[in-house]
């Protein structure tokens, strides 16, 4: 028994001695930047010690040197191709393998430990991901962004890690993969809540598509909390917040956000505010917002269309009152409403503003439908063929 124990001990010592001598040779080559020679020694080390943490750690360091070696070569001559195209991925996997074999493995002097090594790879992976993304190689982009995110997390660089998850979400958007887009955005805001208003806007839209009102509300709440001290970024969320409060019929919060949005003076946002005010039946306030905005941009299509929409909605409200009177057999009241100047004014104004909008953009279906209906109600017949053709063409596209 003792004899066998001695044999095993001797075998362990000889293997350890071999691996250390071998690693010393690799280390010396790397220190003198003899990368191809270091690889030859490393191949021999790995063949004899495939389950040794120190060997895997040195292998990963060799891969890092290979990656840098290629960068230096191609910097001098851009026509060259990488000699070690998989070096950076091999380095990443090598560091992981070393840690899995021995979480306390230590590097030789001047070499990277497993965590430090992965941290060094973060920026290169990020650049590789962006290049792959710009070239339309979505699978590679996702892979490299994923590597970069994990590397940044090891460095406790939460902002950079969150940025990688956000970039992955963008890639998934181009792939129309909303489920994975949502997962990446959730990871991004979990790491850094104020990463970007765009993260919350896209998340809201993803949940809105799923008709998940609860999740939509949670996103709005998280966004308000994340940007509570940054009004400039919170402004970017106003349109989404207005959409949410309008969708759940919360006019109190809707009007509060509308007032803040109007105060920004942004023309597009003012046009949106007018629409929400119109939907909330705040017609006079909607008209004031649009009138103020039109003094700055009198030919703005959204503003002109918004004014037409405002009067059309008022007209429909009036006609709803008439219908209720008819249903209640209050025929005199129904007649009075139908003949009222209020109805005629709303109808005429809806037509005139939609007609102005039509002259700026004749291809908007919603505006064209209202314009045609008002022409019918006002008996401005026949309907122009061009208007009918444009409506029919857009309806066929739906």
Report residues per predicted region.
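Start-of-domain marker
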Residues: 20-71
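Structural motif corresponding to the intra-repeat A-B loop/turn of tetratricopeptide repeats
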Residues: 32, 66, 85, 135, ...
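TPR alpha-solenoid repeat register
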Residues: 55, 108, 157-158, 164, ...
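Structural register within alpha-helical repeat arrays
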Residues: 25, 45, 59, 66, ...
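Short coil turns that delineate tetratricopeptide repeat
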Residues: 50-51, 103, 153, 159, ...
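Residue at a conserved register position within TPR or TPR-like alpha-solenoid repeats
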Residues: 29, 63, 125, 132, ...
């Amino acid at each position: 028994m003792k004899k066998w124990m001695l044999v095993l001990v001797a075998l362990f010592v000889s293997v350890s001695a071999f691996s250390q001598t071998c690693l010393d040779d690799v280390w010396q080559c790397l220190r003198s930047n003899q990368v191809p020679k270091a690889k030859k020694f490393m191949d021999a080390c790995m063949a004899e010690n495939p389950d040794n943490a120190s060997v895997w750690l040195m292998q990963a360091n060799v891969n890092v040197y290979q990656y840098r070696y290629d960068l230096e070569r191609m910097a001098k001559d851009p026509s060259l191709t990488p000699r070690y195209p998989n070096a950076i991925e091999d380095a990443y996997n090598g560091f992981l393998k070393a840690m899995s074999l021995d979480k306390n493995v230590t590097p030789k002097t001047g070499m990277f430990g497993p965590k430090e090594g992965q941290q060094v790879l973060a920026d290169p992976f990020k650049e590789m991901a962006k290049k792959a993304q710009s070239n339309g190689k979505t699978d590679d982009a996702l892979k490299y962004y994923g590597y970069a995110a994990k590397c940044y997390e090891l460095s406790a660089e939460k902002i950079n890690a969150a940025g990688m998850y956000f970039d992955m979400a963008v890639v998934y958007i181009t792939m129309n993969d909303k489920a994975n887009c949502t997962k990446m955005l959730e990871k991004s805001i979990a790491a850094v809540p104020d990463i970007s208003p765009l993260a919350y806007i896209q998340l809201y839209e993803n949940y809105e598509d799923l008709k998940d009102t609860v999740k939509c509300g949670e996103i709005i709440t998280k966004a308000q909390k994340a940007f509570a001290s940054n009004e400039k970024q919170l402004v970017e969320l106003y349109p989404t917040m207005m959409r949410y409060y309008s969708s759940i019929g919360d006019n109190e919060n809707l009007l509060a956000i509308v007032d803040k949005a109007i105060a920004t003076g942004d023309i597009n946002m003012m046009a949106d505010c007018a629409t929400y005010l119109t939907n909330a039946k705040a017609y006079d306030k909607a008209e004031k917002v649009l009138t103020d905005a039109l003094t700055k941009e009198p030919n703005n299509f959204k503003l002109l269309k918004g004014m037409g929409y405002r009067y059309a909605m008022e007209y429909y409200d009036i006609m709803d009152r008439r219908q209720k009177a008819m249903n209640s057999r209050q025929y005199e009241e129904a007649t009075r409403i139908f003949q009222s100047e209020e109805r005629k004014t709303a109808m005429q104004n809806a037509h005139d503003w939609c007609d102005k909008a039509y002259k700026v953009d004749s291809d908007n279906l919603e505006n064209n439908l209202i314009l045609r209906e008002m022409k019918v109600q006002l008996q401005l017949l026949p309907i122009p063929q061009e208007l009918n053709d444009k409506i029919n063409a857009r309806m066929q596209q739906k």
